[in-house]
């Protein structure tokens, strides 16, 4: 059994340890780690192996004569084992458990020492839920906001048998989570909320990379023959596609799940970590989860994101004349009759003048947009006027 090691690390050693941790967790490549640390890839591989075997202690010079501050006691070992077996931490993988011990129990222990304790106690680290075989990684984009990967994943996030859909977006250049939003099922509203949160916090991205789900791409898109395309035939945008056009965002449908490798790896990490974080925070409902995720994203990004090659952001500021609520919604066209009445879902609705709006109601046979969103219900847009 190795002794518990509490080493005082220099800033340089600490920086190396943080970068190597990202490498070991699979969030950056050897090449990226080498560039960040200004070392050769061969040297980085040696450091990675050493840290995996010995933890942070490996980064201390072997001849420094730096001794551990104290050795393990039986009571300390029993405490570690007891905590790992507790309902709070039992589902945490070993690396996450090491971090949680420091964050919530004020216990620092090297990964290798922790591994030895738990291994001898017959405790195994939960296996990663790898959805796809690893593939060669595509080079990151150079700037934040150039390309956003977006997806949703159903999972038992609350530790029950019920699955909920976590919608999310990750920046390709930095690996930074831009937003997360959970709903009962994968849906348009969930994706609209993700985009809304991104734009409010960062701005409008240049492009969004998605799968070929019907939310993003019309099911008729694949039915167009070459002759149809040459003849100029097109298919209607989905509601999401229409909204992205209004915002000037290029929507790029991926050809395979492997093409969205960064967000697929994000889901693996979150499926391992987030249920444990929810349990510690007492999160049990969708509303509680969405409130918690706002703070969790910052914590996650501090640990796992990387610096972009180009520090200039590609996000664009939202123009003052664009109301996100009237863009990120279901928008359908209708025609009104003499009494400013239109039909929707086999029901008739009458447009009323706004109390604070002197605009004239749409005349007969006018084309209007009906806006539908869980946040505000139903609104009507006629030219530039919105009727509640």
Question: Which sequence ranges carry the predicted segments?
Answer:
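Charged alpha-helix within mobile-element recombinases
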Residues: 233, 239-309, 314-326
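Basic, flexible linker segments flanking DNA-binding modules
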Residues: 55-150, 155, 224-235, 313-320
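C-terminal, beta-rich DNA-binding module of retroviral/retroelements integrases
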Residues: 297-388
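Mobile-element integrase/transposase regions
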Residues: 107-108, 119-177, 184-206, 241-246, ...
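Mobile genetic element proteins and their domesticated derivatives, centered on retroelements
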Residues: 19, 33, 44-47, 55, ...
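Short, basic alpha-helical/linker "hinge" immediately adjacent to a nucleic-acid-recognition surface
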Residues: 1-4, 21, 30-85
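Acidic/histidine-rich, metal-coordinating catalytic segments
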Residues: 200-232, 257
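Residue-level signal for the short linker/turn that defines the boundary of a DNA-recognition helix
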Residues: 14, 27-28, 92, 109
